[in-house]
UniProtKB/Swiss-Prot annotation:
Main location: cytoplasm
Location within or outside the cell: Cytoplasm; Nucleus
Recorded name of the encoding gene: Rnh1
GO molecular function: ribonuclease inhibitor activity
Pfam family name, one: LRR_6
Residues bearing the modification Phosphoserine: 86
UniProt LRR repeat ranges: 15-43, 44-71, 72-100, 101-128, 129-157, 158-185, 186-214, 215-242, 243-271, 272-299, 300-328, 329-356, 357-385, 386-413, 414-442
Species the sequence originates in: Mus musculus (Mouse)
The protein's name: Ribonuclease inhibitor
Subunit structure: Forms high-affinity heterodimers with RNASE1, ANG and RNASE2.
Notes concerning its domains: The LRR domain forms a horseshoe-shaped structure that interacts tightly with target RNases via a large protein interaction surface on its interior side.
A single BP term in Gene Ontology: tRNA stabilization
């Protein structure tokens, strides 16, 4: 049983009503409920009295160091079996981290801890790592995004990785680790028997100089399945240094996120070698890189190779034009693996979308999700899209948000959505404007077809 309350300011009467439930439910989530330290004594008593509790989430509440301390005291009892604890954005600072080592030692059942958006800093992280290294601590997943960490924190973290073979997920995104810190972290990973599965280092000040270190990590960690290096200035040189590790048989990576990494078509050449060779790679994001049409051509050639089994490709905001769409048409008609294509925020226009629609109208296409938001599609382009909705049997989600169409274009889509042969399940139309009459028709259709969601 779960108690899941979000974005509700809890009155005294409502709080009195909830306290007995907090003492009973296995999962308790009270996110963004306006809780402060004042309520934490009650929470502490309630969780202490609840031996069934396996998950507690108090994210986005101003608990402060005192409030967090009270909650953790309540969890430290012999009957507590909690497995997942989220204290994201709760105002935990260095001053409140002194309780963490004892908490981690006593909660041997705890497997997942979220401390994102707490300004604990390097000193707080050091205290946390003292607890993580204790033999009684069995934590497997740790999230520390936006925690004011620097390179100083990387040595304690590396020490944890060296001794914790069961550690599976580490999120350090949006911390100023920079080149020295990432090098220390990578060395710790290479030296350890840690079976890490997911490493997220978005916006950590990584440069091309770190990519040889990261190459060694992906080469040595067969357990690693997800790597996020988004919003780091890797450049083409960094991608060239990373890819040899990705090509090795020991690398089993499934998901690679490279948003906004200063990659151009030149960098695509190295990535294309990986796509052709690695059947394990299923998700690739290259959003917000200046790939342009030449980069799209190179990617599509690789997607057609038998060795490529990619299922999801994100190329949002990559300066693609209608000239790139014939390349994707070949992929859409021939690929048996690509299920999701995110092309939003590229000026494809009606010409490009009409080209894509020719391919999507062919029998036996397998694409399930297509994102074309902010692609300069007008009412004219909706005619081709409406035909796709009738002809295509695989497409389940279509995003057309923030395009130049209006009521007439939406009505064309609506006519296709009414037909029994249309199998679409979700249509997203944010920031598109139509009359009240069109709105009434859309909502009436949703009532007639409960399996269809129209989000606007």
């Amino acid at each position: 049983m779960s108690l899941d309350i979000q974005c509700e300011q809890l009155s005294d009467a409502r709080w009195t009503e909830l306290l007995p439930l907090i003492q009973q439910y296995e999962v308790v989530r009270l996110d963004d409920c306006g809780l402060t330290e004042v309520r934490c004594k009650d929470i502490s008593s309630a969780v202490q009295a609840n031996p069934a509790l396996t998950e507690l989430s108090l994210r986005t509440n101003e608990l402060g160091d005192g409030g967090v301390g009270l909650v953790l005291q309540g969890l430290q009892n012999p009957t507590c079996k909690i497995q997942k604890l989220s204290l994201q954005n709760c105002g935990l600072t260095e001053a409140g981290c002194g309780i963490l080592p004892g908490m981690l030692r006593s909660l041997s059942t705890l497997r997942e801890l979220h401390l994102n958006d707490n300004p604990m800093g390097d000193a707080g992280l050091k205290l946390l790592c003292e607890g993580l290294q204790d033999p009684q601590c069995r934590l497997e997943k740790l999230q520390l995004e936006y925690c004011n960490l620097t390179a100083t924190s990387c040595e304690p973290l590396a020490s944890v990785l060296r001794v914790k073979a069961d550690f599976k997920e580490l999120v350090l995104s949006n911390n100023d680790l920079h080149e020295p810190g990432v090098r220390i972290l990578c060395q710790g990973l290479k030296d350890s028997a840690c079976q890490l599965e997911s490493l997220k280092l978005e916006n950590c000040g990584i440069t091309a100089a770190n990519c040889k270190d990261l190459c060694d990590v992906v080469a040595s960690k067969a357990s690693l399945q997800e790597l996020d290096l988004s919003s780091n200035k890797l450049g083409n040189a960094g991608i060239a240094a990373l890819c040899p590790g990705l090509l090795l048989p020991s690398c089993k990576l499934r998901t690679l996120w490279l948003w906004e990494c200063d990659i151009t078509a030149e960098g695509c050449k190295d990535l294309c070698r990986v796509l052709r060779a690695k059947q394990s790679l299923k998700e690739l994001s290259l959003a917000s890189n200046e790939l342009k049409d030449e980069g799209a051509r190179l990617l599509c050639e690789s997607l057609l190779e038998p060795g490529c089994q990619l299922e999801s490709l994100w190329i949002k905001t990559c300066s693609l034009t209608a000239a790139s769409c014939p390349y994707f048409c070949s992929v859409l008609t021939k690929s048996r693996s690509l299920l999701e294509l995110q092309m939003s925020s590229n000026p494809l226009g009606d010409e490009g979308v009409q080209e894509l629609c020719k391919a999507l109208s062919q029998p036996d296409t397998v694409l399930r999700e297509l994102w074309l938001g902010d692609c300069d599609v007008t009412n004219s382009g909706c005619s081709s899209l409406a035909n796709v909705l009738l002809a295509n049997r695989s497409l389940r989600e279509l995003d057309l948000s923030n395009n130049c169409m209006g009521g007439p274009g939406v009505l064309q889509l609506l006519e296709s959505l009414k037909q029994p042969s249309c199998t679409l399940q979700q249509l997203v139309l944010y920031d598109i404007y139509w009359t009240n009459e069109v709105e009434e028709q859309l909502r009436a259709l949703e009532e007639e077809r409960p399996s269809l969601r129209i989000i606007s």
